Swiss-Prot record:
Designated name of the protein: Putative transporter AmpG 4
Intracellular or extracellular location(s): Cell inner membrane
Name of the gene this protein is made from: ampG4
Pfam family, one: MFS_1
Keywords assigned by UniProt, alphabetized: Cell inner membrane, Cell membrane, Membrane, Transmembrane, Transmembrane helix, Transport
Membrane topology: Multi-pass membrane protein
Amino acid sequence: MLITKIFKDYRLFEIFILGIVSGMPLVIIFSTLSVWLKESGIDIAVITTFAVARLSYSLKVFWSPLVDNFKIPFLSRWGHRKSWLILCSSLMVLVLIAMSKENPEVSLTSLYFLTIALGFLSSTFDIAVDALRIDKFDQETQTIASATAVFGYRIGMLITGAGALYLAEITGNNWQLTFVIIAIIFAVATIFIITVNEKELVREKVNITSIISWIYAVINPFKDFFKREFAVTILLAVIFFKLGDAMLGAVASPFYIELGYTKGEIAIIAKLYGLIATLVGGFAGGIVMYKVGNFKGLIITGIAQSLTHFAFIWLNHQPPSFEALLIAITIENFAAAMGATALVGYIGNLCNKKYSATQYALLSSSSSLCNNTVTIYAGKLVNMMGWDGFFIFTIILALPALFILMYLNKKVNV
């Protein structure tokens, strides 16, 4: 079992802890913060503009060479990768403490920029963690190392998702204390990072030749992808496929609060149980793809994930109850995970094996970048359309991807 291997191999334990730290800021930005803002009386249109902090996760590829090559003064003696981890983790402690001192009702702008800073530091931390993991393990053990990192990432998401919401609930809405405790966890993690063993590699000095080589290494996979027929159309299908889900996710937590659900209920059902439904749905999506193939699997899961948004319209007209939220979360998370699994398989199938890593990054980053940009306006749409109208709109958003995929299936082998 994975858990047994983590505690037998200390290197895996290190990656597991780093994975936890990586996963923690993401949920603060994507969900937990929106609950705090909603409870503080902030308008939904303003809340979703905080999604701009997510853009760092989509754009981090552009400063990853800096993390690879720039030595941080003083800290680099601990190790190149560790120096970046220590810097980012330490700064995240300061940002979280600063966030704990803010009151959204009177200092929303400060909180906005602190959230953007947290997103940037977190995404940079992710770059260094991935690099450290790749450096520490050989090719044969990369799979188990990646699985360990993902497992840790999920635990981190639970800590700042379900854990933070439940903590805020039992402390009587004390969000300031909640963020201080999260900051303390990061401070402890920073101390742990200092003890992590880093495999120091001989690094080539950066010169004009290496820079040119790197540019070609980035450009060639892009050129290869866009040389293919219907490349832009394929890219549009990938972008639209999860757009409706992204819009729904941006407003889900404030929606639950508006319906009258407590933070404790959201923590247990939407976050903790929701993760289980997501994992089961991901497994089911893999089975569907295996049984019916890439294209049919993508269409089936695409239709399923869009139609499940009707569950939120139903939820909007139910009195707050444990059972109603459980049903809606089960349906939505299960179908969304099926769709996500199908999309990963489809993107992987599109990539030229020669440039698989870069082309996969191009397609997945394009999707997340567009999704994170558009979700900024989700709150305004809720105010314009009302909740029912908004959920219908998220269902309609899936249609372009499905029509494009059907069109492509007739024209090319996708």
